[in-house]
Swiss-Prot record:
InterPro entries: DPD_II, FAD/NAD-bd_sf, FAD/NAD-binding_dom, Helical_ferredxn. The lineage of its organism: Bacteria, Pseudomonadati, Pseudomonadota, Alphaproteobacteria, Rhodobacterales. It catalyses: 2 L-glutamate + NADP(+) = L-glutamine + 2-oxoglutarate + NADPH + H(+). It is an enzyme of class 1 (oxidoreductase). Gene3D superfamilies: Alpha-helical ferredoxin, FAD/NAD(P)-binding domain. This is Putative glutamate synthase [NADPH] small chain. Pathway: Amino-acid biosynthesis; L-glutamate biosynthesis via GLT pathway; L-glutamate from 2-oxoglutarate and L-glutamine (NADP(+) route): step 1/1; Energy metabolism; nitrogen metabolism. Keywords: Amino-acid biosynthesis, Glutamate biosynthesis, Iron, Iron-sulfur, Metal-binding, NADP, Oxidoreductase.
Amino acid sequence: MAKEPMLQFVKMARETPEKRPRSLRSQDFHEICGRICPQDRLCEGNCVIEQSGHGTVTIGAVEKYITDTAWENGWVVPGKPAYERSESVGIIGAGPGGLAAADALRRAGLQVTVYDRYDRAGGLLTYGIPGFKLEKDVVARRVEQLEQAGVQFVLNCNVGEDLSFDAIRGQHDAVLIATGVYKQRDLAAPGVGSAGVVQALSYLTASNRRSFGDEVDDDGLDASGKRVVVIGGGDTAMDCVRTAIRQGATSVKCLYRRDRANMPGSQREVANAEEEGVEFVWLSAPRGFIAGDAVEGVIVQKMRLGEPDATGRQMPEIIEGADYVEPADLAIMALGFEPEDLPTLWGVPDLTVTRWGTIKADFRTHATSLPGVYAVGDIVRGASLVVWAIRDGRDAAQSILDYLAQPAVVAAE
């Protein structure tokens, strides 16, 4: 995945703090990966000790402990370069991919400016992932360290509206697109526009803003005292159900159209949610919503698993005549994310995209169809994991350095 030094972590955990090596690559953002990576389906899921029946090495907890110790002792320092270079890079998106690239490029001496639509850097690390999984001061201290290293942040900047893509390109020698995917999938169902039927990201963003002390226009985005139904089976759905429990919902149910074994989210997160009081309703999907002034219930259609699709995954089929109404005061749709139409939004028709709308980039160099423009993370892969975005950002930074070292680019400067 992100080339995590797992054996090194285990060895360091055995040492006293005074003997631990302080050369651990801080640009790998271990303090973040140790908290939010789904280790149960990555490194821990492939642990040979687990496969032998002795229980996995909990590398996520070890990684978190080691890096927290390093931060507490001041061993993680800003990555200031040995010498400054005149070339500059503009990065669009202050999420994990953009931050990882900014760190690597700044360490190499380049002048780095990060543009982001939000008022705080971090992207989904700040506004999407709940604070009980990723404490916001952990993200803030990483951003602060990048600022101390000389990375410039331009916030509240929506590219295509506040600043054109061409303007950014004209100001920098290279550009990295790391916007993530923010277009939320919707349902084409009766009652979907009713008050109390909300999108997952809107709900999670409101919750995170409250934790910062921001004034939030409620607009039904608080689960306190409500019967909550979350629709979806991915990691975002798990974040929603666990947030609703913490907000004091009277009941929280999660509808998923397949069974437990076929859900895309982390099984560890499902177990955590169940322990906290969430009820999972498998083989169930919404047909529509009942609403007066606001949502009152979800019309649930029961499903069964049918024949496999082209990927080998069994397709859900509707069981006719088995519909029922699940009472709800708040229905949260966590159906996944799709890429925005960046060529249209940014006025760059020559930026090539795939048939899924993601940016088409070379899988080795991350170069796009535009010279000197690179892309990483979810805007290339589709909705994926933070650890992949971090690795992409580091790898793209090296490609940008290679590009700027080319004779033609040097001559042009």
